[in-house]
Design a protein with these regions (language model features):
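Hydrophobic helical membrane-anchoring modules
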Residues: 1-4, 173-230
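Glycine-rich, basic loop-to-helix element that forms the pyrophosphate-binding segment
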Residues: 62-78
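Short aromatic/hydrophobic "clamp" motif used to bind/position activated sugar donors
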Residues: 83
Length: 230
């Protein structure tokens, strides 16, 4: 893994009970080309996530639970010029850092994200891979897509708002006001695990939450509605 003392990109990974994904995550990060650092931000895992990450040579910090607080904690310690927020079950292409550098060569660009395909030979994965391009065209954005941002832009925005859900959509909306948000054609590979065995119900529920969010319903209220139903 080409982790250096002066990385161009800081890869920030929020985790909670991800012991089964850590070895594959570490292996995929080891295939990246370029200078980077990795900060795993754990929100109090009850399994062996922290131990597994350290065994794989990853730097781990502890942070208040919640993706927003965890990613903000990682960003505060990051030293890269670019911040890349990566879910533990999302896999980047080997030349991901080259795509990011190309996007940010445009001085108007404030950051961006990757397109997505969903891994696994399942009906859920195939359906999500077909659906996602239309969601992206409609302005829907999720953290699975490996959002990246210039460090100075992220700092000026005050980082992630510490919402329990839709913290990624909120950051995207605010970043767009700061400059050009680059939607890369290059694909990251996300997991369809939360949809497996209950695709229609989960997709319908999440779509409803998305519509309510775009209508202006507060994410804290949406989370209270969402938690008992998921």
């Amino acid at each position: 893994m080409n982790i250096t003392k002066h990385p161009l990109v800081s890869i920030i990974v929020p985790t909670l009970n991800e012991e089964t994904t850590i070895p594959e995550l570490a292996a995929s990060l080891g295939r990246l080309r370029g200078d980077f650092e990795v900060i795993v931000c754990d929100g109090g895992s009850a399994d062996a996530t922290v131990e597994m990450a350290r065994q794989c040579g990853l730097r781990v910090i502890e942070a208040p639970r919640g993706r927003g607080p965890q990613m903000n904690a990682g960003a505060r310690l990051a030293i890269g010029e670019t911040l890349l927020f990566l879910h533990a079950d999302t896999r980047l292409p080997e030349n991901a850092l080259e795509f990011i550098a190309g996007a940010l060569a445009d001085e108007r660009a404030c950051g961006g994200n990757f397109s997505l395909i969903f891994g696994g030979d399942t009906r859920e994965a195939r359906a999500l891979t077909r659906i996602y391009p239309f969601l992206r065209l409609g302005g829907m954005l999720y953290g699975d897509s490996a959002i990246f941002a210039r460090r100075d832009v992220f700092d000026r925005l005050g980082g992630y708002r510490e919402y329990p859900i839709f913290e990624d959509c909120d950051l995207y909306q605010r970043m767009r006001r700061m400059g050009r948000f680059v939607r890369l054609n290059a694909c990251a590979t996300a997991s369809s695990r939360r949809f497996e065995g209950r695709f229609i119900r989960t997709f319908a529920l999440w779509s409803l939450m998305q519509v309510l969010y775009w209508l202006g319903v507060n994410p804290n209220l949406l989370n209270r509605l969402y938690k008992p139903l998921r």
